[in-house]
């Protein structure tokens, strides 16, 4: 399973296209048929978790030549399968900062908010189950 933190143009849309997204923590392995949880980036005025979806297209993008350190970018298209029923964003996850406690909230805080950049990340099954509780 995967999660993405990104600026979402229309949070109510039935489908989303995210071009050239940074990947970390196994995010580059995303592929068609994967479940993804969409967080509308608070850095751009979003509200955190807004949707769960199914990846309908995924394409690895060639890295830019001449850059020594870069994560492999990916473009994806996602069909919304559910709308979040409760708020889950930076303020709800911030208290979970004991990085080795194994909690799903801590995994999300670490992967999304320790570095504020938008990105696609791989998540554990436990974190996926936790996120499903928001729908």
List each language-model region with its residue ranges.
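Short, surface-exposed beta-edge/turn micro-motifs
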Residues: 1, 32-36, 48-50
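Contiguous surface segments at macromolecular interaction interfaces
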Residues: 1-3, 10-25, 62-135
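Short coil-to-beta transition motif at edge beta-strands of beta-rich domains
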Residues: 27-41
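Residues that form ligand- and interface-recognition hot spots within folded domains
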Residues: 40, 59, 82
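Extended, low-complexity, turn-rich repeat/linker tracts enriched in Gly/Pro/Ser/Thr and Asp/Glu
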Residues: 44-46
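Short beta-strand-centered aromatic/proline hotspots
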Residues: 48-60
């Amino acid at each position: 399973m995967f999660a993405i933190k990104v600026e979402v143009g229309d949070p109510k849309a039935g489908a989303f296209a995210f071009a050239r997204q940074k990947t970390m923590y196994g995010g580059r392995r995303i592929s068609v048929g994967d479940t993804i949880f969409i967080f509308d980036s608070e850095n751009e005025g979003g509200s955190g978790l807004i949707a769960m979806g199914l990846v309908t297209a995924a394409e690895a993008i060639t890295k830019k030549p001449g850059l020594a350190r870069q994560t492999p970018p990916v473009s994806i298209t996602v069909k919304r399968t559910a709308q979040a029923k409760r708020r889950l964003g930076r303020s709800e996850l911030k208290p979970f900062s004991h990085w080795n406690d194994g909690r799903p909230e801590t995994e999300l805080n670490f992967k999304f908010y320790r570095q504020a950049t938008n990105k696609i990340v791989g998540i554990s099954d436990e974190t996926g189950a936790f996120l499903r509780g928001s729908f």
